[in-house]
């Protein structure tokens, strides 16, 4: 995507990122801070989140706070408590990037282990839904809120062996579409499909692939910025590809 955002694109915006400790989420958190946002980091690993907050500060960004939430074990009550804690420090949320995700096993359907299947659904769908429910009141306080989910190519077209992960991403697309209709005119809701990107998850999914052939998280940030800022103000109910035209599957 060719997009040259204004340096102050996200000034006065408060943006929460899940899975902010690593990979694409870490890069998104750093990038949002560079464009002026006050960033709230959510994840399950305190040391990694603290390191991201420190980097934001070292780069001259606004001080960011981090909060621990393990999507694998979270309950609706834990999500409500998190929203409550956030509301003590912040008046509203202008953006939420649901980025945290779990891959599970890349094996045929008849070999998908039910406990791994349930973990993938819990992190990618159920936990993400519970957190969304808890954060909606804060998002609705913004006059230009943007709620962004993270999908995948296998969330739009099923592919052999992608099992629970693919099914969870179809569910993510559905959740986005339902919410986009329900909050039409109040909150925009979209998905990003990052496309193959050089992260730990990608290396686990394609261990034989040469990572150098992949875009880095930094390369795909233009779309992440565009969807959080006012340049995409009227867009809702859509899945956007961060790498349009890229053929899904292993990079040759
Ligand atoms: P990584 O594995 O590099 O990072 C995943 C992030 O999610 C980490 O911050 C991780 O935390 C966090 N996370 C995982 N499980 C939990 C949990 N139970 N509770 C809270 N946080 C959790 O993945 P990517 O950066 O590659 O992926 C980011 C998103 O993009 C995912 O939704 C993925 O499905 C999607 N995606 C990625 C593609 C790619 O090629 N990379 C392609 C298509 C979609 P921790 O640091 O503690 O492990």
Residue ranges, per PLM feature:
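Conserved glycine-rich Rossmann-like NAD(P)H-binding loop of the short-chain dehydrogenase/reductase
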Residues: 37-52
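Substrate-binding pocket helix/loop in short-chain dehydrogenase/reductase
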Residues: 82, 107-109, 113-119
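Conserved glycine-rich cofactor-binding loop
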Residues: 14, 21-23
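C-terminal helical subdomain
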Residues: 185, 191-194, 199, 208-250
């Amino acid at each position: 995507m060719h997009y040259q955002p204004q340096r102050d694109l996200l000034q006065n915006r408060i943006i929460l990122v899940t899975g902010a400790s690593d990979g694409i989420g870490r890069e998104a958190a750093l990038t949002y801070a560079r464009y002026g946002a006050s960033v709230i980091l959510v994840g399950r690993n305190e040391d990694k989140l603290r390191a991201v907050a420190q980097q934001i500060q070292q780069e001259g960004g606004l001080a960011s706070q981090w909060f621990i939430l393990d999507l694998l074990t979270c309950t609706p009550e834990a999500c409500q408590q998190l929203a409550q804690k956030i509301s003590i420090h912040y008046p509203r949320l202008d953006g939420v990037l649901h980025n945290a995700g779990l891959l599970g096993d890349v094996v045929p359907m008849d070999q998908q282990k039910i406990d791994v299947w349930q973990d993938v659904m819990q992190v990618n769908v159920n936990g993400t839904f519970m957190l969304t429910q808890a954060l909606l009141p804060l998002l609705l306080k913004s006059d230009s809120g943007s709620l962004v989910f993270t999908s995948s190519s296998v969330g739009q077209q099923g592919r052999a062996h992608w099992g629970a992960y693919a099914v969870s991403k179809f569910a993510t697309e559905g959740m986005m579409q339902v919410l986009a209709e329900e909050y039409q005119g109040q909150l925009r809701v979209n998905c990003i499909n990052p496309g193959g990107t050089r992260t730990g998850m990608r290396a686990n999914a394609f261990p034989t692939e040469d990572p150098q052939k992949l875009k880095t998280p930094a390369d795909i940030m233009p779309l992440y910025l565009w969807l959080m800022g006012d340049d995409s103000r009227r867009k809702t109910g859509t899945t956007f590809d961060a790498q349009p035209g890229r053929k899904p599957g292993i990079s040759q």
